[in-house]
Amino acid sequence: MLPRITSNVSVFPTEPDANPLQEWLESLASIATRVPDDVLVLPSHNEPFRGLHERLKTLITGHEQRLARMHTELAMPKRAVDVFGVLFRRHVGADMLIMATGESVAHLNCLIARALAVRELDASGVAWYRRA
């Protein structure tokens, strides 16, 4: 649990159909029911903080909003790299491409699991995503 940024939730090449984002969102909701709000959070980055439940709510809401925007973007078929703008405010350079692609696919796989999107491979094996 980090006070300002969100964890990188990514799909890795070894499990291309995984849905780690849904699992992560469910774990955040579970933490809210099991850990008191006034607990002192000791994050791996930045300073300790209180207000766990508000932070959990902010994280869940933020990712749900990104999922909704991504769904809107999929009116026309897109590749995972084509929806970076929905997730990231800054340009994704070569040094962040693998991590950004993994996070993009995590959001796309979540939409697929919710029956809101589909993935189709073209003749070259490139995955294209569109609304279901």
Regions found by a protein language model. Give the residues of each.
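C-terminal regulatory/interaction regions
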Residues: R69-A132
